[in-house]
Design a protein with these regions (language model features):
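Conserved pre-motif I regulatory segment
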Residues: 2-68
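Conserved SF1/SF2 helicase motif Ia
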Residues: 68-73, 80-106
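Signature of the SF2 helicase/ATPase Hel1-core->accessory helical subdomain module
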Residues: 81-84, 88, 102, 109-110, ...
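Conserved Walker A/P-loop ATP-binding site and its immediately adjacent core
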Residues: 91-125, 160-163, 329-332
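Inter-Walker segment of RecA-like/P-loop motor cores
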Residues: 119-188
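Conserved interdomain linker/interface between the two RecA-like ATPase lobes of SF2 helicase motors
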Residues: 251-361
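Conserved RecA-like P-loop NTPase helicase motor core
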Residues: 361-460, 464
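Long, hydrophobic alpha-helical segments
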Residues: 426-518
Length: 518
């Protein structure tokens, strides 16, 4: 193939540079390697290492390469580019996309479905006329995948990793040998074999692993090997696994685009850490410090909320409804925080009914309702402005309106920073606007402030900005007040936002809200 072939796909899908670079690497790998079923993996590894020495080992029974891209850069779009490229230039028709959990599984299913907001193949002409057949963990037993092959269609299988390992033998007799066999490996009469074996027999099966760090040490690892794909493509923002308390990096990373690069290149929000001027955390008890951090988080939130409203009004774009993420220690702590922030003691009780608690203590209808509120937190009609969670937010929760994070869990500064900010880095308008209030994610961490600032001096740090409450942000909440212009009202019954300014121009008024009494 040629660079023109890569550019054809990249341009049609409007790929960002990191995505385009990844596609170029795949193009080169396929150019120098003979990737066929049953090929000598050791020989292929040596060939790839000759140009990409970072690949030390495939770590699987088949050639598998990891593309590490920071959160928010666009891993799902890159999956679409890989599939479009492999089909157009190499005739590949069988793909198996693996998700680590139900949330990502549902998201992938939606994004690979035509006429959806984030459809991954927008601009690919052949898929517009003849879209791929989407086979999922919910419909594979219908024989849809085999039918797609019969009509020479591209077949994209999307499975939650649990689906290829789950036995689900509840409906079988206790003495039925099939009870010990994963359901996907059981005979389907319409195709004459199990769907798993059907896939494993394909000469061109390519496996794409989303968030691949999540199933490197499970039964799913062996199951993927048993599929015997011709190629594995792994995507993750964290190319390492935790073993015995230590971080073990992947050995098959062929491309690494870390978060620091994404921040530098403007693909995500810029993180900032907040504190108060001349603040000494040692003067306060743990409870007092916690309340100060929550108070200041709301001050930042309300300032940000006003700024986002002003930006939307001035630019004629959608209004973004920001929210705060509070990371609690445990379920008891979470409940205490919610009770305090809904009480009259906290900003006169105006956040009552606007706080969502996400933890393992909820179940049934309440859990379903909370999950729905969490997944729709970007909706302007969703009242939630504060989310409290206890280690329950996993990959797949892709939101763009998180602007303030309050980490209350004990953590060292580096871990605190990197684990927290990943949740809120996606940009609401798809790119930076040039307005700091719109483009910045703020972490409220008075007690860890100096540690994080010291970390920020590291050239590889993710953080370069600081916010001082009482200086950069008012110590009381703010809101946008729309004042009717009487002249406009008389002439055309319109309203506009005005406020006196030193230059004589009119702009929105930002008014103070009484500060919480300590």
């Amino acid at each position: 193939m040629s660079i023109q072939d890569v550019n054809t796909i990249a341009n049609r899908l409007s790929l960002r540079e990191p995505q385009r670079d990844s596609l170029k690497i795949l193009d080169r790998v396929l150019e120098i390697s003979n990737l066929t079923k049953g090929a000598d993996t050791k020989q292929i590894l040596e060939i790839i290492q000759s140009e990409f020495p970072s690949v030390k080992d495939f770590e699987r029974a088949f050639p598998s390469l990891c593309f590490s891209l920071a959160t928010g850069v666009g891993k799902t779009r890159l999956m679409g580019a890989f599939i479009a490229y492999l089909h157009r230039f190499y005739g590949v028709k069988n793909f198996f996309v693996v998700a680590p959990n139900l949330t990502i599984y549902n998201k992938l299913h939606q994004d690979f479905t035509p006429n959806t907001p984030k459809y991954v193949f927008k601009g690919i002409s052949e898929f517009a006329q003849n879209p791929p057949e989407i086979v999922t963990g919910d419909n594979y037993e219908s024989g849809l995948g085999a039918q797609g092959n019969l009509f020479s269609k591209v077949v994209i299988n999307i499975f939650n990793i649990a689906k290829i390992t789950a036995k689900d033998g509840g409906k079988l007799a206790k003495d039925d040998a099939q009870r010990s066999v994963a359901r996907v490996r059981r005979l389907i009469e319409t195709i004459g074999e199990s769907y798993f074996d059907f896939l494993a027999s394909k000469e061109d099966l390519v496996v794409i692993m989303d968030e691949s760090h999540r199933y490197r040490a499970s039964a799913g690892w062996e199951a993927l090997n048993d599929l015997k794909p011709v190629l594995g493509l792994e995507l993750t923002a964290t190319p390492q696994v935790e073993r015995n308390g230590k971080s073990v990096p992947f050995k098959n990373v062929i491309y690494d685009y870390p978060l620091a690069c994404a921040i530098r290149d403007g693909y995500v929000k810029e993180p900032a850490v907040a504190t108060r001027e001349n603040f000494n955390p040692k003067q306060y008890s743990a409870d007092e410090l916690e309340k100060i951090k929550l108070h200041d988080a709301v001050c930042i939130h309300e300032s940000r909320k006003a700024s986002l409203q002003i930006y939307a009004d001035n630019k004629g774009v959608k209004t973004v409804k920001p929210f705060i993420l509070v990371v609690a220690t445990d379920t008891k702590h979470s409940a205490e925080l919610k009770g305090y922030m809904e009480s009259p003691e906290f900003f006169e009780g105006r956040y009552a009914g606007k706080i969502l608690e996400i933890n393992s203590a909820t179940s049934g209808a309440e859990k379903d309702e909370n999950i729905n509120k969490l997944l729709t937190v970007e909706d302007p009609n969703n009242p939630v402005e504060i989310v409290i969670h206890v280690n329950m937010l996993k990959e797949g929760w892709d939101i763009t309106n998180l602007y303030t994070i309050v980490p209350l869990r004990a953590a060292n500064s580096k871990t605190l920073v990197e684990q927290s900010i990943g949740r809120g880095l996606r940009l609401p308008y798809g790119k930076r606007t040039g307005e700091p209030e719109v483009d910045t994610l703020t972490i409220v961490s008075h007690d860890k402030f100096q540690e994080i600032v010291d970390y920020a001096n590291d050239p590889n740090s993710l953080i370069r900005k600081t916010v001082i409450v009482g200086k950069d942000v008012p110590e009381s909440g703010t809101s946008v007040v729309k004042v009717e212009n009487p002249i406009d009202a008389i002439i055309n019954a319109a309203t506009q936002e005005i406020t006196p300014s030193a230059g004589g121009e009119e702009s929105p008024i930002v008014s103070g809200v009484p500060q919480e009494k300590s």
